[in-house]
Design a protein with these regions (language model features):
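Structural beta-alpha unit
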Residues: 2, 76-110, 147
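Short, well-ordered secondary-structure micro-motifs
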Residues: 20, 47-50, 96-99, 122-123
Length: 147
């Protein structure tokens, strides 16, 4: 198995978000890897109303810190994980995630969740996990939804 040094966890607010955070944290601890949690606020629904993206990103960090408080506390207290950070950006989700969060961090591994889109929606918008698998040069681990 590869020795991962930098792990990126893509958070989307879906039901798999905690599972993604826990899996990424476990892998980071096992490998002594730096860990970055990232989230993208979808700008498409907000483009027409002139949203304040800086405020949306700040709110996103607060929301993630709140929703994953227990997981983040455990990760930050784990001496096997050298660094932990949470970053939020606004934009088109898949592209912004890849270009503004993942590529600058240069991870060895990206951990993301399965969104569970309907067949119709998948045809029209695709999925973020599929985009990441096809476009990133590093390993991508997709955490499946539990039935």
């Amino acid at each position: 198995m590869a020795q991962y040094q930098r792990i990126f966890a893509a958070l989307d607010g879906a039901s798999t978000q905690k599972a993604v955070a826990k899996r990424a944290a476990a892998l980071a601890a096992d490998n002594g890897a730096r860990l970055l949690f990232g989230h993208v606020v979808d700008s498409v629904p907000n483009e027409a109303n002139g949203a304040d993206y800086e405020a949306l990103c700040a709110e996103g960090v607060v929301r993630i810190e709140d929703e994953l408080a227990d997981e983040l506390r455990a990760v930050r207290e784990n001496p096997a994980i050298p660094s932990v950070d949470v970053q939020v950006r606004a934009g088109r989700v898949a592209e912004t995630l890849a270009e503004q969060l993942i590529e600058p961090f240069a991870p060895d591994l990206v951990v993301c969740g399965e969104r569970g889109l309907s067949n119709i929606k998948y045809v029209f918008v695709g999925s973020v996990s599929t985009y990441l698998i096809r476009n990133l040069r590093c390993d991508v681990l997709v955490v499946k939804q539990q039935a």
